[in-house]
Amino acid sequence: MSLILTINPGSTSTKIAVFAAEEELFERTVEHPHDAFSGLAGVYGQLEARRHAVQTMLSRAGYADARFDIVVGRGGLLAPMHGGAWRVNQTMLDILESAAHGEHPCNLGAPLALAFARSHGAHRNVQAIIVDPVVTDELDPVARIGGLPELPRRSVFHALSQRAAARRAAAQLGIRYEDGRFLVGHFGGGISVGAHRHGRVVDVNNALEGEGPFSPERTGGLPVMPALELVRRGVYSFERMRSIVQREGGMWAHLGTNDLREVQRRMDAGDTAAAQIFDALAYNSAKALCALLPALTGAGQDVPSAPPVDAVVLTGGMARSGRFMQAVSDRLRYLGPVIVLPRLEEMQALAMGGLRVLRGEETPAEYGGGMS
């Protein structure tokens, strides 16, 4: 029986799971407070702390001496590439460490996978791979065009989570994912919303670089001129503004917490500011999903006579909050069925990618550093 370790570093947590083929044996999450990594040099400075967290979780679950047949990490910010499995190699690690395509904790998925393939591999040639990285790029050509030729839109999103959730929703509806049309929202430290048309994610907000709704940690879209003015006047340096956009904006900037549970506790205690930000978060998320409706119909052809949405699918860590999901869903039900998948599908999606490799159904691609 193939033993698979999956590792998923995110903005606010590190998740691991162990699978015996398709069967999940154990899953654990360690939450990272907003100040857990203060004083460390960038995201890569968190590598040892997160490696120790993974080792601790394995040890406490009785897997300290386990030997894995493959280790699968969450993919990071690389050049645009097709979905599927990719082998972790030195070129990939160098680019992730340099943050050449952006800095985010998902950049640690590949080095963590390689570290545990080496320390806990069943043999010396155990592979470390990534699956469906966040830079999976399937955008329609028209979706790439923005308001400045020098700044074409990029596809950077929670590809693994979104596609796994959409596939699960399609199965619930009794249709093939490749035949359906879905609006999918991933709700975590960042929020990404995607239009899934016939098996491709043809438009999505780049949640890392300031598109879309604000989230627990990110600003989302900001008015450009006032933001530039803050930098010009020296209120914020460029580096400080980047940190705010990616890690210290949104709910954190308004309320001083990135924990939705804490916000709900404040609401229950009568905090009207918390209630207002909670409602704004739900409103902006629903608005972003609705904005993707044109992407589901294509360009002047294959236009459905009925509403184009087979389902709206909501997933991610915040989907565990029934209260928040209700606030989002109530604004979307006129579009069609709303399917909430509160249990994260990412770990299983990572494991299934590893299993396809072990079974010889898929050969990991070799990363060369350029657009693939």
Curated annotation (Swiss-Prot):
Signal peptide: none annotated. It is found in: Cytoplasm. InterPro entries: Aliphatic_acid_kin_short-chain, Aliphatic_acid_kinase_CS, ATPase_NBD, Butyrate_kin. The keyword Protease does not apply. Its EC number is 2.7.2.7. Pfam families: Acetate_kinase (PF00871). GO terms for cellular component: cytoplasm. CDD domains: ASKHA_NBD_BK. Keywords: ATP-binding, Cytoplasm, Kinase, Nucleotide-binding, Transferase. The keyword ATP-binding applies. It catalyses: butanoate + ATP = butanoyl phosphate + ADP. GO terms for biological process: acetate metabolic process. Belongs to the acetokinase family. This is Probable butyrate kinase. The lineage of its organism: Bacteria, Pseudomonadati, Thermodesulfobacteriota, Desulfovibrionia, Desulfovibrionales.
